[in-house]
Amino acid sequence: MRNRKMKVIFFGTPLFAAQVLEFLLQNQVEVVAVISKPDRPKGRSSIPVPTPVKLIAQSYHLPLYQPEVVSSLDFAPVLKNYEADLFVVVAYGEIIKQHLLDMPKRACINLHASLLPKYRGAAPIQRSIIEGEKETGVTIMHMVKKMDAGDMIKKVSVQITSEMTYGELEQALCQIGKHALLEVIKQFDRGEPSRQIQDSHLATFAPKIELEDCELDWNQSAQHLHDLVRGVNPYPGAWCYVKVNGEQKRLKISRTRVIPYPSNCPGTILDSSKGNLKILTGDQALELVEVQLEGKKTMTSEQWIRGMSKNQLKFLVN
């Protein structure tokens, strides 16, 4: 082990990154500066909200920077003055250009929430669930100009259970990811970690989830719809259009269950005298365990339809 600790500049923005940063600090990693995205308004408020990474940096009294464009030439001298050994990037939220990737003395490394080369891109956790994967993980890699294509240093896998949501999987990946990242930083402190080239022929991509991606199409299979609901819970949330007493409204669906049942009329409400709503899909039925009608609180679908007759409610099919 060298006498001088390696100097690290940490780049990150959301809660996932904040938890990783705090873990590194608790384990005596010398973080000399923190870079996070600018504060933005959240929800209906116009007041900017501090990023989770900013809050951790402030609580540890670390130098904090929130440039509008991190790769701007004006900001480069600020980073260069720290003479950092490592740049560590975790869910920062912006592409980092080559002149910054070349700046640290040792490397610029990234914690990516998939088993690369699968699910390169902005939404690897959500996409892995939506695609019905049974396994995913984290990869610590060298950063290069091409997105998520650098040499891999360490990979750790985790199982995706049948009911696991995006939020739950994110926490599981954070736990294994922060330990893997700390181990890699220690490897750099001892020398040069081994690296493995990615096979680009095996690469798949995980583009950002848009709101329209989250609309349920009842013509699709029940399993696919169930996976979509899990993959966007809690954010941005799966949804569909319904008509309640003839008025069209948006229904958010956060928990479901696949029900074996022959289906030939997608979007039809399955006759049931009690319990949660069950909707026919392209192949089976989907039980709506937890729903939220626009303007209302989250509840079970049984609670939502209590006192409502079947002809008062209709699910709209694309």
Curated annotation (Swiss-Prot):
The keyword Phosphoprotein does not apply. Keywords: Protein biosynthesis, Transferase. It is an enzyme of class 2 (transferase). One of its GO terms (molecular function) is methionyl-tRNA formyltransferase activity. (6S)-5,6,7,8-tetrahydrofolate binds at S114, L115, L116, P117. InterPro entries: Fmt, Formyl_trans_C, Formyl_trans_C_sf, Formyl_transf_N, Formyl_transf_N_sf, Formyl_transferase-like_C_sf, Met-tRNA-FMT_C, Met-tRNA-FMT_N. GO terms for cellular component: cytosol. Its EC number is 2.1.2.9. Pfam families: Formyl_trans_C (PF02911), Formyl_trans_N (PF00551). It catalyses: L-methionyl-tRNA(fMet) + (6R)-10-formyltetrahydrofolate = N-formyl-L-methionyl-tRNA(fMet) + (6S)-5,6,7,8-tetrahydrofolate + H(+). Belongs to the Fmt family. Attaches a formyl group to the free amino group of methionyl-tRNA(fMet). The formyl group appears to play a dual role in the initiator identity of N-formylmethionyl-tRNA by promoting its recognition by IF2 and preventing the misappropriation of this tRNA by the elongation apparatus. This is Methionyl-tRNA formyltransferase. The lineage of its organism: Bacteria, Pseudomonadati, Chlamydiota, Chlamydiia, Parachlamydiales. The gene is fmt.
